[in-house]
Amino acid sequence: MSKILEMLEQEQMKTDLPAFAPGDTVVVQVKVTEADKSRLQAFEGVVIAVKSRGLHSAFTVRKISNGVGVERVFQTHSPIVDSIEVKRRGDVRQAKLYYLRELSGRKARIKEKLAKK
């Protein structure tokens, strides 16, 4: 029984996702349906948490909008998520960056991870 479930989940999982980690700045293109029209809306921010659970994987993105912190949790393999683009890699040493909620301004900045030679 579990093999059948695994096969069904494997079929529904997206394969074209980029590798990203907490601390990375990403742009998530989200499909928004208003009345009968559908459009893409960009949500750009820092990934503060990643939950890897196969088909049920999720990640949390945080951004500051008009001086107010906005966090949004996206299901990684959801059909609502159209695409994910990594803008810059962040150099952090923790898996969950919830401490960024308390910081503001320059203290909330994350160092950029430099490419290896």
Swiss-Prot record:
Keywords: Ribonucleoprotein, Ribosomal protein
Keyword Ribonucleoprotein applies: yes
GO-annotated molecular function: structural constituent of ribosome
One GO process term, biological-process aspect: translation
Protein's job: This protein is located at the 30S-50S ribosomal subunit interface and may play a role in the structure and function of the aminoacyl-tRNA binding site.
Family the entry assigns: Belongs to the bacterial ribosomal protein bL19 family.
PANTHER family: LARGE RIBOSOMAL SUBUNIT PROTEIN BL19M, RIBOSOMAL PROTEIN L19
HAMAP family (UniProt xref): Ribosomal_bL19
Protein name according to UniProt: Large ribosomal subunit protein bL19
Species the sequence originates in: Colwellia psychrerythraea (strain 34H / ATCC BAA-681)
